[in-house]
């Protein structure tokens, strides 16, 4: 349920999501919603390893990796499985099970609205970074066809935009990760290989709504037909 639960526990839309996830976990034979999410993460990794292509954005990037690494660690809040997270969860993370990130420090405090220190911008915390711009790297279509395809655009510099996970610390990327775009020493858009497939992570929620808030209306894409951010998506 993300850490939206801290603020929106009484909201009908979140209560509906909780009920839907609990029903699904029970129906599929999982002991809890976190166990269900870990199972989904494992299947996604298997999909990529077997030749699939994965694009994830916003918190789907960071939380997928944390779920993979927490195979034998409890990082879930008590409101999701009835037990508090393990205070030593960070030391029990298995980064060899993840695809793109490593060495993250898990944020287990229920009062801090962040998942880990993988995200550089920490949008909902007191140490939030301001938005800037991110230049796209220029790749050779001959020698790097996939990165060249992923960065194809009509502009070379794009305005940044927030998300629950906005960006990625460079020192949290595995050595094989390819940075497609970054702002200084902060990666925005990354790509990598796993087995026969590839994964691509793009930080942020909505390129045309950089300060997106709960309850905001959906972006009307008809008004943004030349959006460079949506072109990447």
Residue spans for each PLM region:
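Extracellular ligand-binding/catalytic regions of CAZymes and related secreted enzymes
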Residues: 41, 74, 171-178, 182-233
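Extended, composition-driven regions rather than compact fold-specific motifs
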Residues: 10-11, 153, 191-194
